[in-house]
Amino acid sequence: MSALPPEHRDAARMLAVEAAWARAGAGRLVLLRGATGTGRTTVLEGAVADAQAHGMRVLRARCSPRDQGVPYATVLQLMAPVPEFGEAAFAGDDRVGAALFRRVLHSYADRAPLLIAVDDVHLADPASHRWLVESARHVDRLRILLVATERSQYDVDPPAPGLTHTLSPALVRTLTLAPLTPNSAAELVRSAHADASASWVDDCVRAGAGNPLLLRALLDDLGAGRHPTVPTTSAALYPGAYPAAVSWWLDSAGPGTGEVARALAALDEGWDGDAPRELPNGVTRPDTACPSDELASLIAELAGADPARVAGWLTAMTGLGVLRPDLDGRPRYAHPLLRDAVLTGVPATRRRAAHAAAAETMHRHGVSPDTVARQLLLSDPVGEPWTSAALQEAASLALRDGRTDDAAAFLRRTLREPLTDAHRQRLLTELGSLEYKAHATSAGIPRLSEALRLPGAPQDTVRAAVALGTALAGRGRTVAAVDVLRTVEDELTDRPQLIRTLQTASVLLSEQDPSVRTEVYRWLCDAAERAPELIGTAGHALVVRHEATAGLISAAEAMGRLRALLAQPADPQTEPFLIGTAAAVAQWADELPEAERLVESGLVGQRPDLLHPMHEALANVRADILAARGEHARLLAEPWARDPARTTPSNREAHVLLSLVATGEEARAVRFAESLDLRSAPDSWELNRFLYARGVARAATGDTAGALHDFLECGRRQSAREVVSPIVTPWRTAAAECRLALGRPHEAIALAEEELGLARVWNTPRTVGRSLRVLAEATGGRRGLELAEEAVRLLRGAPEGTETELVSALIAQGRGLTAAGDRGRARACLREAAERAERLGAARQWALAEEALGESGARRTASARTGSRSLTSSERRIAELAADGRTNTEIADLLHLARRTVETHLTSSYRKLGIHRRGELSGVLGRAGGK
């Protein structure tokens, strides 16, 4: 008995007690009930063995559907071992036969206690069924224990009356076998696979569905170590005991139940991936659930069954463990393998048809588009208008929730439906844009090319052309991108607004290739002089941008012209270019609040399913704003800063490098730079930004010669593009610092003076202050000190976001004062620099200020008092765990600390970091993940 699961042991003990009473002359009918596969036969065999061990004779029969047409087939099985029966003549009359069987049975039982064991009595022929019922009325004073097993399971088809339907409860003892509990099932799995992992055991338990038959069949198929993970399809199982057991389980339930079970399995397939496990912050789960009452009606309609019976079956199967409710409350199969086994043998065409029928029925019932669309993903084309509408609505909802993979899948499925060319063009443009952004497939550009070849509305054709041009330029094919836009431009001679859109996009995309850029900007500037009305406000904004980078205008003039352009009536097609260009120039002009407002306004107008060059441009400006403010920790916390898929340098990688250096991770910055492949990088402005950033990282780690090479190469490339202003990459002052470190001050002074001249043209505190500071370091002496003091004065009155430059200027002034022997003033400057750097979290600047303080003769501080560098190792560890979303209790358990200790450390960390809420931790700790 110890080998039996607990659910069987209780029944076996009860049967043993009843057998003892029968041996004492108090017979009874015991009905052992249970669902298919719950072990009725196993328990009955145990009772037979126990009875024989106690000297009881045993008569047994196993009923079968084949016996239904043979009168007394079950009784004849029982009587076969009885010697007296062989001598009796059976005339075939029911009443005579029944009396004869009872007489022979009583005679046989007089000699010794008797156990009559009938398995699957619900399958007995009608005559035997009546005889067993009548016999049960007369065994209470005989030494006979009549034990019958009966299937007791809720089926869609109403069952026939059971054995005890007409018997008094006093004559019957009913035992019901419950399904296996998760613990009992896990014990059975571990008894066969002692070394199995917890997840493997859990998969087996769920696939076994609380059913001993299914669980043992599964364990037979899994064998000894053949499957490191539990499969999700029956095809992976050998020899196939599990799917055979599931098939038998379904057959036992009848055709109606089988149809309902398969209909639910088809629906269940469509629910896979219904919603992501984690959604972006602030996004709620989509309304994908089908209400339970509607689900029963839906399945009933698909299977041609009674909705009330279907609802009861769903409830019963959930109780047995075959089904489990998901997070939306829908009953689903306990494991994908069980669901697949239910569908085994169903042809693929029938399954696809079932999904189509399910989708149509759901649509008619008003189920959410997402749920309908997931059924359509598994169906053949339907050809009805509602199909494409439901799929597109589901795609829109997925995009709203940030589930771009789902949106792309829905759009792919939509394209399989019959569509007009114009409709297909729009969908191909959206899908191609999503696939290009995903980087997981190369289908994006071919789809966009196909979209452009289809006839459609002019504005849709322009959208397709801009999307294709953006994709081509992003892959380094700038010439092809501009050619695409020009080709479409030639076809739209009567649409001046759309032509301006294409021309503006050509100008922006040309930034990715120096030769194309020169040609396009020459045309743009000529057009601005000859026919300014032709290029529109966005074109004029690009002219302002070009003049700014060429060092031809001041920041004040640039912003004045751009604000005037922004005040003019907007062209919806070109407005994104105007806003994005104005945002970039505002950031260069240190008008950071205005730049930030423009970025947010521009991003609101961008569609996630439509490639547009301004989307990437606006994202770059947002990163530039964070860097300008010295918010390096926030930059490193951005999702793109931790994206391991990016292997070529870009503006974002440049910001990661600069932020790592600023936060004291110089060695890590160099390793990151070396991990990127510059050979495959397009010859674009982004490569130049990266070369500058790599130079900063090399200089910070002592590779001055390597840094100088990067700065000069950056300058050569920028000059070739007519980008001479230091507003983008101040390579001259960076190279000057390297020249100075290499002992070539005259060359350093020349570079610094050249940049100062260009900086005074742009005339913002950041650019002028930086040039003055480097020129001061290169010049030295009294003149150098005067230049450093001028830089500090200028930067003290600068707009917000220039504090990192002020810190550098204070360090330069402090070093100059130390060299001049004015150590008191030097220490004051350097202490201010250290305090400002500490508040900013600028670890490298703080270290430089501390080093300069030491050179001035001041006592070095032991450590930072605020900022992320001030955290102790314990505080940082706890803060990082909290930033990852762990609760105080979880942190305490993980680190074996008291919860109060965790709370104390977090309170101290908040104070040092200058924050007030747990949600701010990830932004200030400044981790770049894999990078």
Regions found by a protein language model. Give the residues of each.
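Alpha-solenoid helical repeat architecture
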Residues: 27, 70, 255, 274, ...
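Short secondary-structure boundary elements
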Residues: 38, 184-409, 413
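Conserved phosphate-binding/catalytic loops and adjacent sensor/switch elements of nucleotide-binding enzymes
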Residues: 38, 42-114, 123
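Internal alpha-solenoid helical repeat scaffolds
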Residues: 49-54, 166-167, 199, 205, ...
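Amphipathic alpha-helical segments of tetratricopeptide repeats
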Residues: 319, 396, 412-416, 449-453, ...
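Helix-turn-helix DNA-binding segment
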Residues: 825-828, 854, 859-931
